[in-house]
Amino acid sequence: MPLDLALKRKYYEEVRPELIRRFGYQNVWEVPRLEKVVINQGLGEAKEDARILEKAAQELALITGQKPAVTRAKKSISNFKLRKGMPIGLRVTLRRDRMWIFLEKLLNVALPRIRDFRGLNPNSFDGRGNYNLGLREQLIFPEITYDMVDALRGMDIAVVTTAETDEEARALLELLGFPFRK
């Protein structure tokens, strides 16, 4: 039996028809849709201690349900004591059902757990219909308990859409339930 992905169902049953009405698309393939969600964690301190990378990878795998890929330094920078090829971060690309599961968890559980949360910044679109947000700590996700955490690590989340303008992307994400600041 397939998973019941409420957010995915909402997209097909409510959001897509509303976007067609609002922007007057001729074809359903013109309607903006979510392509992927990329979660990135920069771990500069991992160059001194490999255990930091392992612990962060374990936490990110719990949050996303997928093993993260290690990102490595493209070139050496002596001021940062960095050599080409050193592991300096983690990245996970979520598509299809895992993407919908992650977004549902982000919107319904994680974001409401942020202290003093007043909404997402509506200016964080990149001009090409993609949205980026940064989180300061991994504790807001239900899979991470306080006892597991050795250090607070933030992450960047990029929501990649097929929208061609920020206006279309914002309409898509608002209809999906992203809580933007007014």
Swiss-Prot record:
Residue ranges the record marks as coiled coil: none
GO cellular component: ribonucleoprotein complex; ribosome
Annotated InterPro entries: Ribosomal_uL5, Ribosomal_uL5_bac-type, Ribosomal_uL5_C, Ribosomal_uL5_CS, Ribosomal_uL5_dom_sf, Ribosomal_uL5_N
Keyword check for Transcription regulation: no
Biological process annotations from GO: translation
Keyword Ribonucleoprotein tagged: yes
Gene3D superfamilies per the UniProt record, alphabetical: 3.30.1440.10
Domain of life: Bacteria
Gene Ontology molecular function, alphabetical: rRNA binding; structural constituent of ribosome; tRNA binding
UniProtKB keywords: Ribonucleoprotein, Ribosomal protein, RNA-binding, rRNA-binding, tRNA-binding
Pfam families the UniProt entry points to: Ribosomal_L5, Ribosomal_L5_C
PANTHER family found in the cross-reference section: 60S RIBOSOMAL PROTEIN L11-RELATED (PTHR11994)
Family membership: Belongs to the universal ribosomal protein uL5 family.
Stated role: This is one of the proteins that bind and probably mediate the attachment of the 5S RNA into the large ribosomal subunit, where it forms part of the central protuberance. In the 70S ribosome it contacts protein S13 of the 30S subunit (bridge B1b), connecting the 2 subunits; this bridge is implicated in subunit movement. Contacts the P site tRNA; the 5S rRNA and some of its associated proteins might help stabilize positioning of ribosome-bound tRNAs.
Subunit structure: Part of the 50S ribosomal subunit; part of the 5S rRNA/L5/L18/L25 subcomplex. Contacts the 5S rRNA and the P site tRNA. Forms a bridge to the 30S subunit in the 70S ribosome.
Designated name of the protein: Large ribosomal subunit protein uL5
Gene that encodes it: rplE
